[in-house]
């Protein structure tokens, strides 16, 4: 059963979450920086990597769309993160960065993004690509697992929230509305245990895998902060 959503957190999530659109993909992202008239959005690498011309449309909370570009100069190795930027004179809220290292199993978390599909009923679904802001979704849940070692692609925050295709790259927020992770893996992914290969190349035990596949997974914001510090060094 999902937890009730704090209205303040819901408002923050709506303001900082964007939809990233290209000819081939649709995903989500979160605004993490504003400098002069340039906004930087953090998302998943798998949201942006398959687009050939590397330009995107970003849908912001006011319903406007902006031309954005993938910052290919900032690479995160195998970690499934990417940055895109857009320029505008409009003013948008920037996410406040939380401390993912202080999360504990059982803590409330909220996951936001723009699902690609909407189930009309058990037999019929509709694409949300042209829905605009109406497609936005915010789910509540709890931290379910914090393994000592991350997955090969940086995922290390398991949570009970339901996320859907298209919500990849969207924010995971703590109870104060601070950014603690980036959505990226939904529950019971295709590919089985191989999807959960650990950073050292090993696979989890069958018992651990069964717990992992029953959760959604995010990359902790602390992982991003460490990578950015390393790149700037």
Name each region found by the language model.
Residues 1-32:
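Protease-domain processing segments flanking chymotrypsin-fold serine proteases, especially trypsin-like
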Residues 2, 26, 33-79, 89, ...:
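Catalytic-histidine neighborhood of serine endopeptidases
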Residues 2-10, 115-117, 121, 130-134, ...:
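C-terminal cap/linker of serine protease catalytic domains
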Residues 16, 20, 29, 39-43, ...:
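Terminal peptide-recognition signature
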Residues 18-20, 54-63, 109-112:
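Short conserved beta-strand and strand-loop elements enriched in small hydrophobics
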Residues 21-23, 44-46, 84-91, 97-100, ...:
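A structural micro-motif recognizing beta-strand termini
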Residues 78-83, 151-160:
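Short, solvent-exposed secondary-structure boundary/capping segments
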Residues 93-155, 163-167, 183-196:
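Flexible, gly/ser-rich surface segments that form the specificity/activation loops bordering the active-site cleft
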